[in-house]
A protein has these predicted regions:
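HAD-like aspartate-dependent phosphatase fold
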Residues: 1-140
């Protein structure tokens, strides 16, 4: 399912002549396991970091952290990702997509691909195929 969304985003971008696609990433139960506030131990799902690194290194991909975490925790997460060479362009927003005659992004911002367990992403089975797909797609 997520591969279908990625392929559709790439196909549409190519057809429209877009230079970038916008990818949203939830944190808990998508990139990291949830601990529901018990301690600071969080584990990354297999292939999550490798996949995020590939995407972070691309100029044609915009990474958006999509989280309901508190600001203090977001700062901690962003620093951790930065130390791992993963850079999110935005947090809970996409200022690059502006309102037009056919779309209003004041409340719901624009994105192409959504990684969120609440949207059907299954981290234990979906990260590896996404990683493999990107390796093939980008020829790494």
């Amino acid at each position: 399912m997520i591969i279908d969304a990625i392929e559709a985003a790439f196909t549409r971008a190519k057809k429209q002549g877009w230079e970038k696609t916008y990818w949203l990433f939830d944190l808990h139960d998508t990139v990291i396991t949830s601990n529901y506030g018990v301690g600071e131990v969080e584990e990354y799902f297999p292939f999550a970091l490798e996949t995020l690194k590939i995407l972070s290194d691309r100029e044609d991909i915009v990474l958006i952290l999509f989280t309901s975490s508190h600001d203090e925790k977001i700062k901690v997460y962003m620093e951790k990702f930065k130390n791992l060479g993963i850079n999110f362009n935005y947090i809970n927003e996409n200022p690059e997509a502006t309102n037009s005659s056919y779309a209003n992004f004041d409340v719901k911002f624009y994105f192409n691909v959504l990684f969120d367990d609440k949207a059907g992403f299954h981290p234990m089975k979906d990260w590896e195929p996404v990683y493999q797909y990107l390796i093939e797609y980008y020829g790494k």
